[in-house]
């Protein structure tokens, strides 16, 4: 189950919890987020942060996103639905994957004869962009962002063809 971590923040003075608008809010390019911390930590961070560190358009977009709870709830349902579908589909394909509570899923090809770099190339040739994880020390794996329903269906179709299942 998902844990916000707020219990850690409530029980310890040295805990900082950060959140981003990049994932569920879909505002990755704006680099906007927020955090929870004790007043002492917030004061220390405020002394070293640059002035005007977030532009007005980004603040406006983040503010609008936070107020639109109907859209957020719809997006959460979409991500949860597709997390479950992709988890089951990748399981059928014998791909190693972790249960995810985010808008992306990590898949590993160690139990298959095909390597992640080849799958990456074949998906890219089909217009499906995923992220290689080798640069993060996670070998033979890809990170797949949950997209729109049609994009996810295309991914499943293409993965079945690549793996001949």
Language-model features and meaning:
Residues 16-28, 45-56, 134-135:
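Active-site PLP-lysine loop of aminotransferase-like
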Residues 32-39, 107:
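Short beta-strand-to-turn element immediately C-terminal to the catalytic PLP-Schiff-base lysine
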Residues 80, 84, 92-126, 142, ...:
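Conserved PLP-binding catalytic core of the aspartate aminotransferase-like
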Residues 39-44, 112:
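Short helix-loop capping/hinge motifs at secondary-structure junctions, enriched
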Residues 43, 63, 67-97, 119:
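Conserved PLP-dependent catalytic core of the aminotransferase class-I/II
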Residues 1-24:
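Active-site pre-lysine segment of PLP-dependent enzymes
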Residues 122-131, 135-165:
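PLP-dependent enzyme catalytic core of the Aspartate aminotransferase-like
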Residues 29, 101, 137-140:
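Short acidic/glycine-enriched loop/turn segments that link adjacent beta-strands
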């Amino acid at each position: 189950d998902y844990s916000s971590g707020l219990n850690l923040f409530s029980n310890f003075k040295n805990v900082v919890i950060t959140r981003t608008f990049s994932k569920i809010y879909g505002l990755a390019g704006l680099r906007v987020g927020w955090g929870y911390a004790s007043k002492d930590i917030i004061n220390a961070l405020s002394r070293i942060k640059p002035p005007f560190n977030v532009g007005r358009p980004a603040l406006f977009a983040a503010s609008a996103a936070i107020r639109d709870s109907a859209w957020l709830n719809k997006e959460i349902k979409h991500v949860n639905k597709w997390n479950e579908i992709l988890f089951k589909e990748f399981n059928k394909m014998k791909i190693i994957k972790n249960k995810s509570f985010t808008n992306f899923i990590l898949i590993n090809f160690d139990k298959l004869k095909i390597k992640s770099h080849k799958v990456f190339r074949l998906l890219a040739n089909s217009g499906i962009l995923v992220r290689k994880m080798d640069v993060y020390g996670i070998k033979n794996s890809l990170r797949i962002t949950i997209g729109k329903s049609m994009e996810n269906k295309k991914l499943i179709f293409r993965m079945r063809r690549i793996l001949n299942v």
